[in-house]
């Protein structure tokens, strides 16, 4: 996500998305989208790029005609990226109960896995899960308020990967360290507190300058 400016309260934003690529990965697909976000004067407020993993459902005929693949050997667990770096900030935060309903109204994303417990269970989940962008927003808020001097306008670009579902009432921890390959950039990840489950990984935040940086 790249940000040209801060958005105003109650501002009307229109998003146009185009498909840039569809890549097959096994029986599944990776869909790459690029979105442009425009204000009411058709001026660009920012852009975003998305990689979506789409699971393909195998037909009964295909399953009956193919042999099962041998069970793959488990890969050794890679160390947390943060564990190999010098942590310069670590901040805990709580995911409020009911946040999915508020975020659904604010964002317009009313996918039932976020607001309908029974539907979420039919989809194989234990209950409603938090929107990925909602989790991202809460994590970036912690970074901004506690480590960027409370100046969101200094953020110019954010990239990350959603790696595990987040549930209402979860306690999370965001950790960050300076990027060695780029100035005015920091890396971060978000873990479920008290465990080693990463819910956001490969996070990178680029900011305008270090004038207001609090570390």
Could you describe each region identified by the protein language model?
Residues 118-184, 190-197, 212-215:
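Catalytic-pocket segment enriched in acidic/His residues
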